[in-house]
């Protein structure tokens, strides 16, 4: 009998459906249902002058005729009609929502008459709730709010497949075949406890055994349901803590409304379920009263187009006026750039480029259904100690949606999406990674060069197509990842070596071409600059505690964050005809200049100027226009975008760091490399070792250029054919 005790005590008359209600309780229920019915039938919007419309009556009729058996009720409308009704619904939503749905069914019956033949039976109506009240946080939900209506924002990180749940069941006794039908099952994740005994008394036959009942599937009434996993918003997570999760239960028309990665605000009933079977051992009996919480969803609002946690929706008219005044200032571009990481000295062009990344260009949907990304991707390469990681940390805090991750601790699944087993249903479910959770914002990836090549390849699609396609464990789907990527990396040798050219960087051109701007950050030795920098750092340390207000000409962090969210939501500038003409002419000049350079040097350039670079300049121009809330991009914006592109990607390309995979583009160069490699392999067999200095000296005597010898050695090391030993003095051949 120990198992019986663990499951709680149930009475044999529990199959009678709901608990019997006294006359007073029944009368009160009827009275409340009547008031709900009056609300749905009589609530109207409009004035005497413009005329009234019956909001919910008309909506019920329209939805019912379209075959959509649901209606969305605003809690503010209910409160303005009858304050007590709204209070009942907030404090005891489980029973009163049922009354509201019954009232909606009766009103739908009235407004849809006469119905066609065969449709005489009125369908059940699902009522969804919506409220403009301030949302709470997952970590603020306490036991006092149990069984109350709550409003919670967050990100959907996992969704199960849609399954069926019985709302009314029929059971039959195995022994005497006695059937009990139409037993109501409570909504949510609560199950139904089968009666232990059959009470049917028949003379002359033995008594029915214990646990005789089984469910008749054909006579059950079922609805669709789906469970979701909600994670709290990143900006609501205290520093150093893990984000909290909450299980959600959706049924009927609320199923399949969201996918992992969606930012949502849900209205639901804070409920509890039994937290699994407790152990039969005595020491675990203390957990008999413990229940795990979940939210039974009664309304979902999805933040569309990932504009940044609906930040624009919470902006007051006074703030909007302030933002419009800010946008028309002639020096807004410099002001925003100055406000980005003000504690970091210099790096003006990088800060301006980060400002463009935060505002982003305009996403375009073409007539054939394809899209062109509007987000700007930025890569910072260079020396340690140049505040790359500090800039990344600031952007994570400043962006409306920001996710920070480090390359060494990030896997392909963690960045894109993973498929795992649901511990309850044992079905496969999908969980979105960093780039899915940052949909509509910025992903900051530090130590980009420390990532494994396989993991780095996983974000190719996310960076250009802005989607993540999954085909594993029987799940084939596409998730949105409409986010900018801000990455920071060190060079291969730790510090940037100008003599090494493209050997400083170990990235494939496939990933480099996806970055709109690539900055090489060098720690240059300049006495005047070092003096100014040291003075700035000392000032930051001395005034770290005292300085609270923002410096003149800067925007404080919260205002900047709201301004970025407002501009992203309200403005999507396009190129003006003059700006497009100017950009076209400059692109043709860049292409012809590259062609002339190839003709003069009789060598094909390894730095291509392609359409992808042209689109990058367009995106930068649009972000400059968005900063000023302009509908069209001007020639001045195009000039500045071309200047930024020149000081970043083109300068990096001219330094030789973005050349092809081999770095040698002519046929003669390739033949020379293969000759050096063949001679090198002949020099020492597999498993032997030789001094690197002597190898280089031998090849130099044969008049081979030193950079070509180093290139071959680096290539062979990358392929795992040789590696260094004895403090990089000796080469050892592996294969």
Curated annotation (Swiss-Prot):
Please state the protein's primary subcellular location.
nucleus
Q: Which residues of this UniProt protein bind ADP?
A: 372
Q: Does the keyword Nucleotide-binding apply?
A: yes
Please report the stretch or stretches of sequence annotated as the MCM domain.
Answer: 332-538
One BP term from GO: double-strand break repair via break-induced replication
Question: What PROSITE patterns does this protein map onto?
Answer: MCM_1, MCM_2
Q: What is the protein name given in its UniProt record?
A: DNA replication licensing factor mcm5-B
Give the species: Xenopus laevis
Q: Which gene encodes it?
A: mcm5-b
